[in-house]
Amino acid sequence: IKVFSGQGYKLSDSVEARIEEKILSQEPMKLRTRGEIGRRHHGMRQLKRDYIDFVASTIESDLAGLKILADCANGAASATAPELFGRFKARTDFIHRDPDGVNINSHCGSTHLEDLAAAVVRGGYDIGVAFDGDADRCLLVDETGGVIDGDKVLAVCALDMKRRGKLNGNTIVATVMSNLGLHEFCRNEGIDLVCTAVGDRNVLEEMLRHDYRIGGEQSGHTIFTDVETTGDGEVTALQFLQVLARSG
């Protein structure tokens, strides 16, 4: 289970520790009544539409000319990615988009890129996009089947942001697990790299502390604070694809 604040951010370690302390305490807790808790929104179809509208609005490109293959990991993206990518002019095909409650992440998605890489090469696609089961992560493969991990996503998107004057603080936030290649890339491109402890929450806290705009992990959690409050695989995919379309 993931709990978010009213501002859309993951809870800090200190807040989670206080909640855990309360739960484990033997002292009786005063429980709030229904009227004090708030209201539940149950419009699932509207929520799905709102989500797709939002993600589509995060880029300006129509992605025309791209041939994309997306792996939905038999998970959350299966319900949203086809309609989302259908909003753009790219040709997009999908694999592993038939969840049955058991096959999520099973030999597919961002943790198993073999099927996607082979299918991209076989089908002559420009790019392959892979989500994980809950679609908060995104990795990609190029036209040769080569893996584009989270560090490479950070590098490509940050360089594009720098060239457009959008890289606030001239900084990428990554973790101590980042590849040395990312460090070398940043040195060569004159970009500052700040590394945090492992975990996208640590990355986000550092980004918010200094108003940095891009950060993430090698595993595919990427955060663009210009458009979101947490990592989202479908947002990441569109941000990367927009750079690809823009570069021709």
Where do the PLM segments sit?
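Gly/Ser/Thr-enriched, mixed-charge loops and adjacent short helices
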Residues: K2-G123
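Glycine- and other small-residue-rich loops at beta-strand/loop junctions that grip anionic moieties
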Residues: R40, M44, A70-A73, N105, ...
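Short, charged, surface-exposed secondary-structure boundary motifs
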Residues: V102-H107, L159, V203-L208
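Phosphate-binding and adjacent anionic-ligand microenvironments
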Residues: I127, R164-G248
